[in-house]
């Protein structure tokens, strides 16, 4: 229909990615062997409460994540800005809210529609730095029991972990239609988004051609305008800006233009920005375990 765009079929990994250390490629697996050790691949922590076996990889650049994915084939990639945007709007339509962190409610409302949200996610692990220096700690596949259903699964620290953390603690790990931790736990690099600092704001560029994704600007990256100049809670996004052409707005890109919202109004999410002159920035999405 008029104004619509076709979104081609793609696959999204069920879990946050780790690295196959033997072949140096990304892998979305439930596996606690050294071959798939997550975090920064620190073997010294094996057998301790801080073990990185079975958790996603971290401490890698966007370029490194992309390169490790592309070793699997030209059509493979790391987490994707355009995919994330699609997932967000599918959620927003299904749950009729922009706040994905509303309390989870498995029941439909009286009219047969979804209600609530996906819960707070893994976002209140307040002693994270002291616990394990902010490395991942939620095992890949923790929500596997849900299959492709949306829900949350409790993750409770064992006795040794609780001593290290300083108290007993439980996090509730969300899965949206089979995609584990769509937000929270660890910040996620998202490919296809680049921005150039101007000292005042970021000039934002988006690529729709996954085979052209890069860490430097190329001809596939489209100038989308600029983001909000300061940190703050998102009130409006570029996709709702009437001055932007409909051909660009139709993708629904979640680029903040007004950061005067709050934690309970509008988009309810926080936007961090930096804009040093000439610096090229990527996008980290989803928040982290202590935020």
What are these regions (language model features)?
Residues 1-182:
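Short aromatic-cysteine micro-motif
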Residues 196-208:
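A short, polar/charged loop-to-alpha-helix boundary motif
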Residues 83-85, 107-140, 144-149, 157-159, ...:
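C-terminal, surface-exposed recognition/capping segments
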């Amino acid at each position: 229909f008029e104004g619509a765009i076709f979104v081609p079929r793609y696959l999204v990994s069920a879990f946050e990615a780790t690295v196959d250390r033997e072949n140096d490629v990304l892998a979305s697996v439930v596996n606690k062997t050294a071959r798939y050790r997550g975090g920064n691949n620190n073997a010294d922590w094996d057998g301790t409460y801080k073990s990185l076996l079975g958790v996603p990889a971290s401490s890698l650049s966007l370029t490194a994540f992309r390169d490790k994915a592309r070793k699997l084939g030209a059509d493979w990639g790391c987490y994707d800005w355009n995919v994330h945007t699609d997932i967000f709007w599918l959620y927003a339509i299904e749950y009729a809210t922009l706040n994905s962190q509303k309390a989870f409610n498995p029941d439909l409302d009286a009219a047969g529609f979804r209600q609530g949200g996906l819960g707070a996610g893994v976002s209140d692990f307040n002693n994270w730095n002291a616990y394990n220096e902010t490395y991942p700690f939620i095992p890949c596949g923790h929500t596997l029991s849900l299959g492709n259903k949306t829900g949350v699964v409790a993750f409770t620290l064992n006795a040794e972990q609780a001593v290290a953390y300083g108290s007993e603690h439980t996090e509730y790990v969300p899965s949206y239609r089979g995609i584990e931790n769509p937000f929270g736990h660890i910040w996620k690099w998202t490919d296809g988004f680049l921005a150039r600092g101007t000292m005042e704001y970021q000039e934002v560029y988006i690529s729709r051609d996954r085979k052209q994704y890069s860490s430097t600007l190329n001809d596939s990256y489209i100038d989308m305008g600029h983001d909000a100049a300061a940190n703050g809670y998102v009130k409006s996004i570029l996709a709702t800006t009437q001055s932007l052409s409909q051909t660009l707005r139709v993708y629904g890109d979640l680029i903040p233009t007004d950061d005067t919202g709050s934690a309970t109004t509008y988009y309810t999410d926080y936007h961090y920005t930096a804009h040093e002159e000439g610096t090229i920035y990527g996008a980290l999405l989803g928040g982290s375990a202590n935020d």
